[in-house]
Amino acid sequence: MDESSLEHKYKLLQRQYDFCKIKADTVTQRIKAIEDVSAALFVEWESELNEYSNRSLKARSRQQLKLSQQHYARLIKAMQRAEARISPVLMAFKDQVLYLKHNLNAQAIAAIEHEFIEISLDMSQLIQAMEMTIAEASQFVASLSEQKALPGY
């Protein structure tokens, strides 16, 4: 797979992962909100039972409360089981996205290694040119020294 295709696939999967992560977080928040609202509803219902003057209505309301709490408990457990399955799937998805990203990183390192080889060659040529220039300068300085040493100048 060529680099641009790999990068395109990575970016696409990363966007999809981000979207799924947001959706998973939203599910968690909604379940929490349902739990909070339900808890408040049941507390209020329980406290209002004492406001009944009619025993029969109070008993029926208490029975309805009990049935509603049981129904709620089944529903919330089902939601929590579904939510618990989200995390492993999301983690496996993230693993795949990270692996793809790291393949891109490996390709980038390979490109850097190629660049290093080119820079090394350029540096070798530069050092060679500098050594030649230094040698020429040394010869020139030596010739100047010889001219000073010659008598009559």
Language model features with spans:
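Extended amphipathic alpha-helical interaction segments
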Residues: 30-110
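Short, charged, amphipathic alpha-helical segments
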Residues: 7-15, 58-66, 110-117
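N-terminal Sec/ER secretory leader and immediately downstream segment
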Residues: 1-29, 34
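Long amphipathic all-alpha helical oligomerization modules
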Residues: 87-153
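Extended alpha-helical coiled-coil scaffold domains characteristic of the BAR superfamily
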Residues: 20, 24-27, 68-86, 123-137
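Glutamate identity and glutamate-enriched acidic tracts
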Residues: 3, 7, 35, 44-48, ...
